[in-house]
A protein has these predicted regions:
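Non-catalytic cap/lid and distal C-terminal segments of serine-dependent acyl enzymes
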Residues: 19-281
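Sec-dependent signal peptide recognition
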Residues: 1-9
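Absolute protein N-terminus
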Residues: 1, 18-19
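Hydrophobic h-region of N-terminal signal peptides that target proteins for export
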Residues: 8-17
Length: 281
């Protein structure tokens, strides 16, 4: 009986230390629709008026804003890391940028015909979320990370907006599509357009063509690329790492055993959140 009582007390204690995830939305004039997002709020968020650093956590192609909560179990990971002191208290924002029917639903973080998502993200989404959920709201307290399409989106966002983010953690990142890595056909549906947008916003070509001033700005961001050794996008992370080294832009590259799946990304998140935390000012 004493053991059962002790376990119950422990369960109550852990529950009282947990953060929570809520679903919210932003009405976008740029996209002409309501954009849903999930946001993780750390324990005690409602009991104080402090300002928090923020992480934008991006999903992959064919997923949506629920993926990191439901498949990645990010609340468990965040609660554990914050409680242990491995990560600081932070808010984590998971915006919607797609859906499972990739041929008929817009997916992607870049501007493309009919879907100016990058404009929405920086002009509408970030200001609205950070105002409502009292984020610190500066480069030193803002990070972006994501998997696959979201890993590529995170990388390119930091390349194109280095004044906005302190760090980028890209998991199994879709960084380029010169070789049609996602197997898109010639039919010009919505999957075709996201494929073309990734090609046009190649993170590899961006570094290859960067001038000295651009490289200087890229050095103000902390970079981490994490990809499985059997991932079909493996070569892209390795290639970008080499380009960064050639340009004297410091980055971290981790190649671990794994493929393009949630088992890999769940473990990656355990490294990504402390990485972001260490690089907040």
């Amino acid at each position: 009986m004493k053991t059962v009582f002790t376990l119950l007390l422990l369960a109550v204690s852990l529950a009282s230390q947990a953060g929570r995830i809520i679903t919210d939305s932003v009405e976008s004039k740029v996209l002409g629709e309501k954009v849903l997002y999930n946001i993780y709020l750390p324990n005690g968020f409602d009991r104080n008026s402090k300002l928090y650093p923020v992480v934008y956590l991006l999903h992959g192609l064919s997923d949506d804003y629920r993926a990191w909560r439901d498949k990645g179990r990010m609340q468990d990971v965040a609660d554990e890391l914050i409680e242990s002191g491995e990560a600081c208290e932070m808010i984590i924002v998971m915006p919607n940028a797609g859906g499972p029917d990739t041929h008929n639903t817009w997916n992607g973080y870049f501007n493309m015909p009919g879907w100016n998502y990058e404009d929405f993200f920086f002009q509408e989404f970030v200001p609205a979320v950070e105002m409502k959920y009292h984020a610190v709201g500066d480069k030193g307290h803002r990070a972006v990370m994501g998997l696959s399409m979201g890993g590529g989106g995170s990388t390119v966002y930091c390349q194109r907006h280095p004044d906005m983010f302190s760090s980028c953690y890209a998991m199994s990142a879709w960084l380029d599509n010169q070789n049609n890595n996602v197997g898109v056909g010639q039919e010009k549906d919505k999957r075709y357009y996201v494929s073309e947008a990734v090609k046009e916003h190649s993170a590899l070509r961006f570094v290859e063509q960067a001038d000295d001033e651009t490289k200087k700005q890229l050095r103000t961001v902390k970079w981490f690329f994490d990809c499985g050794d059997d991932d079909f996008l493996f070569d892209q992370s390795v290639w970008l790492h080499q380009l960064m080294r050639n340009a004297r832009i410091k980055d971290e590259l981790r190649i671990r055993n794994g493929v393009h799946n949630w088992e890999y990304w769940h473990l990656a998140l355990r490294m990504a959140l402390p990485f972001a935390s260490r690089n907040f000012e």
